[in-house]
Amino acid sequence: SNDQTLEVTIYDSQKKVAQVTSKCANGSNLILPIKNIKLWSPETPHLYDISYCVKDAKGQIIDEVKSYVGMRKVHIANGKFYLNNEPYFQRLVMNQGYYPDGIWTAPTDEALKNDILLSKEAGFNGARLHQKFFEERFHYWADKLGFITWGESPNWGMNPDDEVASRNLLSEWIEILERDRNHPSIITWAPLTVPLSNVSSGTFARLVFDLQKLTKAIDPSRPFNDLTGSGFHFLTDIWSISTYEPDATRFALSLKPDKNQAAYANQPFIIGEFGGIVWETSRTKEDTWGHGGTFTNEDALFERIEKLINAIQSSGIISGFCYTQFSDIEQEKNGIYTYDRQPKFEMERIRSIFEKIPSRPIKK
């Protein structure tokens, strides 16, 4: 109706900091300037409250929606990832969102929150949300607690030559982008993960191009990683590889783009998967699976992880890593925590190893 108005107000701790009123109309763009803006980051996850009020000609509220907003910027330049115009190193952990009772369904909202708190306690500033569309409440807690994430989709074993499967993926991906794009904690879109069949086929390349164009059309503000952790890339803003090499010397040699793949164009270079080390306890002895052998000596395990981190730190070209993984799941017993989220190790020691690489460059 022409006599209705939309009033948008932004609050900081209940204090009004910006407000604008406009006639109700489809497609209107509103700008709300905020003085002395407080930026969102994992270290200072500041959120503003925001309200949208539809009022009639007499100024009476007809409808009202309340939400929140985080102010932050992500971009890539000169082979680095930037958060709020500063280089930012991503210390990610792989989280597959499994739980002992509900499998892919978290038992409570508190469980989603706790996964983030435990990840931060272990020294990570974010996570790859691996092979799952995570609950909206997880993204809420990531916004609230300060935890960066990569948004992925479940496509393990998908055949891109199957037209129905490809169309379903594209449709679902659009829904996820539209649902989650306003979360400041999500900093990268990564729709595909290996192994997929026929990744060298023309139909797969077409699927990648379609996903990239759709993603950029809906959300041009975030980097796009076409095939996470593969080293096999078509059209990507981030160059990611996967290496579970346990030997630190050989691991260090693998930390570079594969010359046999598409030409590397100075994208931020990220280790999409590494680690996966098994610590054998009485709870994990049966059906144990991981990478690089099984450890029974805790000091030896810490030494292995630290040597891998040292290799990453010494490379000079790495913009982030993703350690496998947050918790044990089903047959995979290579988590920092057990399946029921109990710590396997001395968390202060684990944290000190992963935090050897600071999120931001140390200013001299």
Language-model region placement:
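Secreted/periplasmic carbohydrate-active enzymes, especially glycoside hydrolases
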Residues: 1-141, 145-146, 172, 187-188, ...
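Substrate-binding/catalytic cleft of secreted carbohydrate-active enzymes
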Residues: 114-119, 126-345, 349-354
